[in-house]
Amino acid sequence: MDPAGAADPSVPPNPLTHLSLQDRSEMQLQSEADRRSLPGTWTRSSPEHTTILRGGVRRCLQQQCEQTVRILHAKVAQKSYGNEKRFFCPPPCVYLSGPGWRVKPGQDQAHQAGETGPTVCGYMGLDSASGSATETQKLNFEQQPDSREFGCAKTLYISDADKRKHFRLVLRLVLRGGRELGTFHSRLIKVISKPSQKKQSLKNTDLCISSGSKVSLFNRLRSQTVSTRYLSVEDGAFVASARQWAAFTLHLADGHSAQGDFPPREGYVRYGSLVQLVCTVTGITLPPMIIRKVAKQCALLDVDEPISQLHKCAFQFPGSPPGGGGTYLCLATEKVVQFQASPCPKEANRALLNDSSCWTIIGTESVEFSFSTSLACTLEPVTPVPLISTLELSGGGDVATLELHGENFHAGLKVWFGDVEAETMYRSPRSLVCVVPDVAAFCSDWRWLRAPITIPMSLVRADGLFYPSAFSFTYTPEYSVRPGHPGVPEPATDADALLESIHQEFTRTNFHLFIQT
């Protein structure tokens, strides 16, 4: 069932939860659009405000007009010393996606004048201990074949004068015309002096790489920065790109499983393990390969220590004949090919590689912020963008509540189920609680439902700014038969009361949560 068609937006909604309506004095308090509730207070917008918002939320759900900002960066950064500048590798990059970026506002003079190109410009830098952004680099966004806008900060670095062990990247987006869209922060990045040369152990897992984590691979011929190429995917094929990198999920593979099947295997990846790389965007995979440690341009065949950040490694295709050097993943200009290694004449447990077969591995992080400005009538920035991480259902019967765990929550947010606003309580920047609307708000014939109803969940700011989420809520019905159906006896006079009790019991025990992918 389409939640967008649940009710007429011109009619103020009836109470949608099992809680009673507030009295008139409470409603007057909450009719203030800019009201900031105290933690622990249940709030709901006024009926007039809800009616206005409801039509806009419905349009956002139907037209899919969200805008997404995705920041992709490495987990660690190597510190620069003296006058040197060790630019972050791979360089932090930003993707702007979603149809909302292509909506042309009527008030936008630039669009009216017929100008083309990105509607925003970006500036990226490091946060500082004082909380303000340091020197920034301007991002030049380019449109990709998949319609995403891509920008890259190639000259960011952290000097030895900065004594922090961790920092964040700060992205500032400004709309054409000068209005600030918002300031977005990356995940924490760990600062290291140089790649660890010691034998790794699981006693200190800070820099180890676990199965299922995201990594990037890059190659530098003769250790020259200008020759850096990144493993990436373009047009459905693996390539070695000089300008754009991709994140891959590193799975511990099972040699006895079907290709593409990754049974859950916890733990840290060790050299000598069979692994598989899966592109996080396209899902395209490389064949299972054995990851080898590299030292002095040789693959070490007898090393089984844990892999560490910024280590040099090689990927050997299994099935090499005994006594041979093995076949390895290699780049040739922009192509990804196979390289036939030679056995080391002096040491049997080594294979001789070329420069193009030696890769540097590093863990990556990404963070996404989604919003839609088409509903809001505000000049305020869209940030901080709330992020939902988990949901926790409690109660049932007359009242079922749902707690949202995440970050960047504030008292001006309301939880929406489809186009229905839920009574919301702000607890902390990491917790919101809402009352689950009755299923009758989405289907008048809920007593006769035979299929689950899945409702998308979102957050809406007091000024109408819409924040979609990846979460949905599913009402799962009991099997019921509509009265009057051929061959079915008429229900008893107390059938409605019985059905209501069944509904309440079902409400208590049979809610299910799903994450949309």
UniProtKB/Swiss-Prot annotation:
One of its GO terms (biological process) is signal transduction. It is found in: Nucleus. InterPro entries: Beta-trefoil_DNA-bd_dom (IPR015350), BTD_sf (IPR036358), CLS_fam (IPR040159), Ig-like_fold (IPR013783), Ig_E-set (IPR014756), p53-like_TF_DNA-bd_sf (IPR008967), RBP-J/Cbf11/Cbf12_DNA-bd (IPR015351), RBP-J/Cbf11_DNA-bd_sf (IPR037095). Residues 26-48 are annotated as: Disordered. Residues 78-88, 193-198, 220-225 are annotated as: DNA-binding. Its main location: nucleus. Residues 26-37 have a biased composition (Basic and acidic residues). It holds the Pfam family TIG_SUH. Keywords: DNA-binding, Nucleus, Transcription, Transcription regulation. Residues 387-512 form the IPT/TIG domain. GO terms for cellular component: chromatin; nucleus; transcription regulator complex. GO terms for molecular function: chromatin binding; DNA-binding transcription activator activity, RNA polymerase II-specific; DNA-binding transcription factor activity; DNA-binding transcription factor activity, RNA polymerase II-specific; RNA polymerase II cis-regulatory region sequence-specific DNA binding. Belongs to the Su(H) family. Interacts weakly with EBNA2. Does not interact with any Notch proteins. Putative transcription factor, which cooperates with EBNA2 to activate transcription. PANTHER family: RECOMBINING BINDING PROTEIN SUPPRESSOR OF HAIRLESS. This is Recombining binding protein suppressor of hairless-like protein. The lineage of its organism: Eukaryota, Metazoa, Chordata, Craniata, Vertebrata. The gene is RBPJL.
